[in-house]
């Protein structure tokens, strides 16, 4: 059985400012660094053999902290990037007009082929995330990889593992530096292939989550 850990990056300056990041970038806050350190402490004894990260700065920064504890190098894979949010990237959510907010909402409300102009659809996102996950099957036997990616990207991936359409309503909260795990197995009581073992675990984090403060 192959176990793959999935980690969202730590809190960023733009998370705090409620700016749309997408494939643009923002550095981790001090809390984000602390969150990554707590992930590292949690997984350092889990037998992680590979750290594979989105090539965006916030994920690489998170991955490097985890990799030091696990004594692994960081491998980057652009397929693990966040959803491309097109013309709305770098915008503060509070500044969006009615049309722009409708574009943003179409990504999370179940709209088939919802997208922001010049951005990706959830189906396009799911296709590359699934390809990145499936590439773990080619790793040497007994590998235990950890992938560092993004909130919408990981939520979409987990939804499709459950058999939901990529554009299904977004109902899974994956907080900064949450840990999920998917296993590839043949089981008499589960569908063969990828199954979800855990999703959105934050028991290793000590600070109040940003989305608890910003309700």
Curated annotation (Swiss-Prot):
GO terms for biological process: glycolytic process. InterPro entries: His_Pase_superF_clade-1, His_PPase_superfam, PG/BPGM_mutase_AS, PGM_Phosphatase, Phosphoglycerate_mutase_GpmB. It holds the Pfam family His_Phos_1. GO terms for cellular component: cytoplasm. GO terms for molecular function: phosphatase activity; phosphoglycerate mutase activity. It comes from the Bacteria. Pathway: Carbohydrate degradation; glycolysis; pyruvate from D-glyceraldehyde 3-phosphate: step 3/5. Substrate binds at residues 8-15, 21-22, 58, 82-85, 151-152. The keyword Secreted does not apply. The active site is at residues 9, 82. Its EC number is 5.4.2.-. The record marks 150 as: Transition state stabilizer. Belongs to the phosphoglycerate mutase family. GpmB subfamily. NCBIfam families: PRK03482.1 (NF002901). PANTHER family: BROAD-SPECIFICITY PHOSPHATASE YOR283W-RELATED (PTHR48100), HISTIDINE PHOSPHATASE FAMILY PROTEIN-RELATED (PTHR48100:SF1). This is Probable phosphoglycerate mutase GpmB. It comes from Proteus mirabilis (strain HI4320).
């Amino acid at each position: 059985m192959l176990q793959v850990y999935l980690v969202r990056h730590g809190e960023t300056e733009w998370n705090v400012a409620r700016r749309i990041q997408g494939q643009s970038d923002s550095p981790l806050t001090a809390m984000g660094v602390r969150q990554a350190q707590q992930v590292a402490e949690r997984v350092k004894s889990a037998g992680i053999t590979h750290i594979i990260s989105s090539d965006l700065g916030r994920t690489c920064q998170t991955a490097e902290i985890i990799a030091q504890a696990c004594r692994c190098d960081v491998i980057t894979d652009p397929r693990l990037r966040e959803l491309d949010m097109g013309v709305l990237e770098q915008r503060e959510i509070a500044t969006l007009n009615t049309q722009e907010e409708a574009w943003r909402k179409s990504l999370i409300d179940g709209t088939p082929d919802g997208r922001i102009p010049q951005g990706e659809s959830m189906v396009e996102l799911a296709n590359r995330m699934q390809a990145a996950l499936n590439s773990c099957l080619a790793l040497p036997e007994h590998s235990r990889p950890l992938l560092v990616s993004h909130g919408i990207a990981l939520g979409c991936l987990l939804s499709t593992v459950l058999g939901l359409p990529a554009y299904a309503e977004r109902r899974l909260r994956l907080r900064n530096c949450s840990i999920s795990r998917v296993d590839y197995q043949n089981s008499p009581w589960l569908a063969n292939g990828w199954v979800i073992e855990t999703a959105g675990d934050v028991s290793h984090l000590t600070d109040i989550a940003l989305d608890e403060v910003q309700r």
